[in-house]
A protein has these predicted regions:
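Catalytic strand-loop-helix junctions within cyclic-nucleotide turnover domains
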Residues: 25, 64-73, 88-115
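Short amphipathic alpha-helices in soluble, non-transmembrane regions
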Residues: 39, 76-83
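Conserved helix-loop-beta segment at the catalytic/binding core of cyclic-nucleotide signaling proteins
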Residues: 11, 36-70, 89-91
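Active-site-proximal structural segments of metal-dependent nucleotidyl cyclase/transferase enzymes
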Residues: 1-24
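Residue-level signal for beta-strand positions within conserved beta-sheet cores that form or flank
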Residues: 5, 49, 92-96
Length: 115
C-alpha cells in the first residue's frame, strides 16, 4: 500500500428485504443464492486488478481493497451496489449490507513469518 493509504476488508452481505433477524425463509434463501452469481459478475467489472475477492458464505463476498482509504472503500462499495441494482432490477428487493474494516497487522504477526 502507498504511504498514506491502507488495505481494507469489505464484506458485502445480501439480505432479503423482509429479513428481521429471525429465520430466513426458503424462498428468500433461493432469491439470495440466485443473486450471488450476478453480484460476482458486478464485482468482476467493478474492482481493480490488485483487489482480491472471494465468496465468504452463501450470502457474502469478502473483498480486499489495496491502496485505499476508508472513504475510498465506501465509494467502491456504493458503486458496486448501484451497478448491481442497475444491471439486476429483479433483485432490487434484496438489501446489501456493507461492513468495512481496516486491515491490521502487528509486529508479532509479522515477526512470526520474517524470522
Amino acid at each position: 500500500a502507498r504511504f498514506d493509504e491502507n488495505e481494507y476488508i469489505l464484506l458485502l452481505t445480501l439480505k432479503a428485504g423482509e429479513y428481521t433477524g429471525s429465520r430466513v425463509s426458503d424462498v428468500d434463501l433461493f432469491r439470495i443464492r440466485n443473486a450471488m452469481p450476478h453480484l460476482a459478475e458486478t464485482l468482476k467489472k467493478s474492482l481493480r486488478p490488485g483487489d482480491a475477492v472471494a465468496q465468504f458464505s452463501d450470502s457474502q463476498y469478502v473483498i480486499l481493497l489495496s491502496a485505499c482509504t476508508y472513504e475510498g472503500g465506501m465509494l467502491v462499495a456504493n458503486r458496486i451496489i448501484s451497478k448491481f441494482y442497475q444491471d439486476n432490477k429483479i433483485y432490487r428487493n434484496l438489501k446489501i449490507k456493507i461492513n468495512i474494516e481496516k486491515v491490521k497487522t502487528t509486529e508479532n504477526i509479522l515477526s512470526k513469518y520474517t524470522g
